[in-house]
Amino acid sequence: MGMTASNAIATFFKYFVLILVGLIMIYPLLWMISATFKDNSEIFAGIGLWIKNPTLEGYRNALNNFGGSINILQAMLNTYSYVLPKVICTVVSSCIAAYGFGRFDFPGRKILFSIMLATLFLPQVVLNVPQFLLYTKFGWVNSPFYLAIWVHCAFATETYFVYQLVQFMRNVPRDLDEAAAIDGCSSFQTLYKVIVPMLMPDLVSCALFQFMWSCNDFMGPLLYVQTPAKYPMSLFVKLSMDGDTGFAWNRILALSLISILPQLIVFFCAQDQFVEGISAGAVKG
């Protein structure tokens, strides 16, 4: 049966709104890409995408060393040398903690879970001073392995992901646990042989969130990394902004674009599982 006029109009407006919102969301990224090929005068002349006098000076300057101590490649290697361990530790520890809260009944479970959730209301700035003092005593500040930035994630300190995975586990039938126990599986065998494969889209979504948040983190490296040669991309971009003599915005935008490319690639490669994981978490809360 053909589409009626009212349905056609409704469909047109629906897609029109979606396309309009999509353009509004993506326009800043498109402008940033075009601005990397402009000089300062053209960048501040307007917000259009058209490039009158294209130049690669921004990318050439972005690849130069700053003070001879670090370049963009080293900064990216520094970034992922703590981002990857942080993501792995977060996913593993949060999954184990969520498994304990979501599948077992033990004395004080609800109280402990409530206390854990209460930590979500603590601003990170409140924790910065005690954490800095503690990590200083441990000798982790300015550690070559960035221990102060990621080691705590091995102890399920990322409450948001624990809570998120608990919600996901509520969608997994408990009959599977009983069937695994009948087959002789221990609790940990049930976790990684039965639960984890079913939670893979949810784990991917948690990993993506942590990956993007860690790559964009500025305060953590600012507190715990004190040697310019160890700076990650977030501090490297700030290092390239000389407030005394002024700076070329095409270089800053080129650095920013290069820094987010790995995040975009990872997101687009895992977007199907990411959407599936987010949708699964919304089924039951």
Where are these regions (language model features)?
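A structural signal for multi-pass alpha-helical bundles of membrane permease subunits
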Residues: 3-285
